Amino acid sequence: MIIANDATTKGGSFFKETIRKHVRAQDIAFENRLPVIYLVDCGGANLSQGDEVFPDQDHFGGAFYRQCRMSASGIPQIAAVFGECTAGGAYIPALSDEVVMASLASRSNRN
């Protein structure tokens, strides 16, 4: 399964619709034990839609839960970071099994 953010569209931020697609792709990957490749160039959640992006298991926090659940189940997750990786977007590579970052083009808030 490939899940991607596009920084040329609203900075790659997660909106209500974006996170629903992200979570649905994770559910399909989990149900079918498919490896996941995240293509990350993300500005995190769109804070102006916080009440629609964060609230429950099918929203932003649920994506992180699903990453942890897949990791515990042995489903490989690889993050390829192509640019910014700020706020909640930094958790995607941090929770992945392997991370590939483009030299001099990638930054993550991960310590």
Question: Which residues are covered by each model-predicted region?
Answer:
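Glycine/charged-rich beta-loop-alpha catalytic/anionic-binding loops adjacent to active sites
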Residues: 4-11, 72-76
